[in-house]
Amino acid sequence: MSRRKKAPIRQVLSDPIFNSKTITKLINTIMLDGKKSIAERILYQAFEIIKTKTNKDPMEVFQLALDNITPQLEVKTRRVGGTNYQVPMEVTKRRKETLSLRWLIHYSRLRSEKTMQECLANEIIDASNKTGSSIKKREDTHKMAEANKAFAHFRW
């Protein structure tokens, strides 16, 4: 364990257009090399694509997608008596949001559409319909936790 103080959790400002801290966190996750204006443009254009494709409020579609991606359990490695065990643990609220945003962006970048806006929009739409790679990642994480349920007593 480090003897240094824990870094304080910085408060994120709400997004000016959607008035949501989650959107700001998503923009920060999309951002590469500190280019925030480009990340904002990608997200806002992706939301426009979602609006035209689904004829629904893009914020509602995004929130539904995020709820579908969010993991409830994950496995953490614990060393007990010289053996490493994959111990299933509940995910904290903050980590749930972080993981779901990270997975959404990661699997958007792996898609083969022409622009990042299209990739992100289609991944959000797929996630809201409970399909897509980010949903598969969540299911795989839950399967790992279920398979290692026998080691749940190592949780401390």
Curated annotation (Swiss-Prot):
This is Small ribosomal subunit protein uS7. Keywords: Ribonucleoprotein, Ribosomal protein, RNA-binding, rRNA-binding, tRNA-binding. GO terms for cellular component: small ribosomal subunit. The gene is rpsG. Pfam families: Ribosomal_S7. It comes from the Bacteria. Belongs to the universal ribosomal protein uS7 family. GO terms for molecular function: rRNA binding; structural constituent of ribosome; tRNA binding. One of the primary rRNA binding proteins, it binds directly to 16S rRNA where it nucleates assembly of the head domain of the 30S subunit. Is located at the subunit interface close to the decoding center, probably blocks exit of the E-site tRNA. One of its GO terms (biological process) is translation. InterPro entries: Ribosomal_uS7, Ribosomal_uS7_bac/org-type, Ribosomal_uS7_CS, Ribosomal_uS7_dom, Ribosomal_uS7_dom_sf. Part of the 30S ribosomal subunit. Contacts proteins S9 and S11. NCBIfam families: rpsG_bact. HAMAP family: Ribosomal_uS7_B.
